[in-house]
Amino acid sequence: MSDASKRSLNPTLMMNNNNTLPKPLEESLDLKEFIALFKTFFAKERGSIALENDLKQAFTYLNEVDAIGLPAPKSVKESDLIVVKLTKLGTLHLDEIYEIVKRLRYIVVLQNAFKPFTHLKFHERLNAIILPPFFNDLILLLDDEGQIKQGANATLDALNESLNRLKKESTKIIHHYAHSKELAPYLVDTQSHLKHGYECLLLKSGFSSAIKGVVLERSANGYFYLLPESAQKIAQKIAQIGNEIDCCIVEMCQTLSRSLQKHLLFLKFLFKEFDFLDSLQARLNFAKAYNLEFVMPSFTQKKMILENFSHPILKEPKPLNLKFEKSMLAVTGVNAGGKTMLLKSLLSAAFLSKHLIPMKINAHHSTIPYFREIHAIINDPQNSANNISTFAGRMKQFSALLSKENMLLGVDEIELGTDADEASSLYKTLLEKLLKQNNQIVITTHHKRLSVLMAENKEVELLAALYDEEKERPTYTFLKGVIGKSYAFETALRYGVPPFLIEKAKAFYGEDKEKLNVLIENSSTLERELKQKNEHLENALKEQEDLKNAWLLEMEKQKEIFHHKKLELEKSYQQALNILKSEVASKDTSSMHKEIHKASEILNKHKTDQEIPQIITSFQINEKARYKNESVLVIQILDKGYYLVETELGMRLKAHGSWLKQIQKPPKNKFKPPKTIVPKPKEASLRLDLRGQRSEEALDLLDAFLNDALLGGFEEVLICHGKGSGILEKFVKEFLKNHPKVVSFSDAPINLGGSGVKIVKL
């Protein structure tokens, strides 16, 4: 036997091979217990939870049935064996026929319940199920316990009557012996015991002198189960009649099975319809039992909006409110801050919506797209037996998904298992390919480089998990548009790592990287402030919109008034013209020409062009002006309408005349800047992108950017000029060398753009 064959027979290796199989999606998303709980609401045990029907149609049925109510079906068994037996011309047992009857009765109950609601789509579906006459008779054949009703078969009725009579005689005999004085010393109790289908007595040893019979069994205490000789003959008759009853039932089952074979196609249809109705009932009962809501997946919307969604695995969840409006969501930020649970929540909501399973969510304000496939790369695929490393396993999973379209993919800790810089470049390429194939992706990562690279793509959203530095714990909230800090040192301290080791680690970490983290924190702070300002602006914008609507209404009103006035003037003009014509008819021609000439002169006198004078603001040297809410002094007049101005702090700026506002006449004495605190300008930013600009435009933008950065109090900024031919980089270097406020500048680290970006210290 070869080594390969031996390995294949090794049970340990076989178990390891099974472990390499991907986990079911519901297990990866922590939905296993939730789905198991949901399955308990079905009338029939089933593996699949999918709805084998049109989702839109099923959603309509759910709403209609929820408003009226649906009676729950009895529990039923699997129907596959019934179909197989009938297909092979076999005979069904009575309990299998009863499984058919239970389904038929449920259909009939539904049809009767929805008879008054003819306007419903669900009524149309039920009405389409027309039972053949044979099945109406079959429903009446069995009782609620699945036994043949009395009167259905005369022979069977006679046998049952005989059986009942004999059982009564047997009971009477046992009762007589149980209360007999001769047998009292040997009786353990006076009850009738049932063993092997026979009623018998429980006796002590030595009974043979008092009674004769057959010992059926001994008890654990050494007593004897005895069938008296007089009851033995009756027991034989009972057994004989029981056999005759079984034969009669078998004959009836054979007859019924032959009839059912003729309706095999209808039975397949019946089983399928019952399973669908059972699925609806299970979903409704599950939703009512746990106060859950349904979300119909959208086949047109691409964006995902979740409001007050709670993952089922969480006992005290903080409801998730999130808008995922682009093709990819990159989640960064603090360790143990809820990034993985956010990823699982997004995929879980899509999975549950796809199968119309109710969830804890505000359905009216939520939108979930329909995805053909949902995949999760969450667990570590490492397997030593199959020589698969973590990174190799991840690549194997990715390679299987590269051809997929219209799927939702979730990847947790995407950088797992290899070098960070190489992984960033590799995953950027893989993710961009998947995005081009109309897929939506959610990733969690601590790679700042990967986040920066992907942020350049317009279809990528950034989301950061936030950390409360005062309380020293995650807030389990998220901020859009920023790259979050991991807070690895703080997390390690929170989970018991000694502080002196944390300080030592920070020293190894380096000052430059710590500054980068400070920049990231400042960026997050500015983003939060900007978010608050945006809310105020939205309110102000709404007020302006209301004013605009009121103004438009007033304009329409004034237009209507103007139109009425115009009609009145035209009417007056026509009347005057008619009077003039009648007057002219009575006068001579020369007098008429004089009047017309005179009127023409009067009209020309009032004919003037109303030109709006253009106000051109110009400034003189030593004249005060206002620049972006700052008081400045004009020092020098430059070309193309530019001025060199000096702020109250003594900084000199280059500004266009259109940016300046005249406030008062300049003082005669030289302007002395007082020591005041100047607020940061709203336009201040940490980064300037000059790529694609002409040299002259780029230098103007750079000058204004540095001015704003100085006013904002920034000590370090980033200027992106790109690599390209190097012309723009040359101009930028020359400008920075000659700028009086630039302390130094250097190329940025590789993860921030390398030689295509300059870090400028002010």
Curated annotation (Swiss-Prot):
Q: Which GO terms describe its molecular function?
A: ATP binding; ATP hydrolysis activity; ATP-dependent DNA damage sensor activity; endonuclease activity; mismatched DNA binding; ribosomal large subunit binding; rRNA binding
Residues that bind ATP: G333, V334, N335, A336, G337, G338, K339, T340
Q: Which Gene3D superfamilies does the UniProt record give?
A: 3.30.1370.110, P-loop containing nucleotide triphosphate hydrolases (3.40.50.300)
Which positions fall inside the Smr domain? 688-762
Q: Which SMART domains match?
A: MUTSac, MUTSd, SMR
Q: Which superkingdom is the protein from?
A: Bacteria
Under Pfam families, the record lists: MutS_V, Smr
Q: What is its EC number?
A: 3.1.-.-, 3.6.4.-
- Biological processes, Gene Ontology terms: mismatch repair; negative regulation of DNA recombination; rescue of stalled ribosome
Q: Which UniProt keywords apply?
A: ATP-binding, DNA-binding, Endonuclease, Hydrolase, Nuclease, Nucleotide-binding, RNA-binding, rRNA-binding
Q: How does it assemble?
A: Homodimer. Binds to stalled ribosomes, contacting rRNA.
Q: Report the protein's function.
A: Endonuclease that is involved in the suppression of homologous recombination and thus may have a key role in the control of bacterial genetic diversity.
Please state which protein family the record places this protein in: Belongs to the DNA mismatch repair MutS family. MutS2 subfamily.
Q: Which NCBIfam families match?
A: mutS2
Which PANTHER family does this entry report, sorted A to Z?
Answer: OS10G0509000 PROTEIN (PTHR48466:SF2), OS10G0509000 PROTEIN-RELATED (PTHR48466)
The protein's name is Endonuclease MutS2
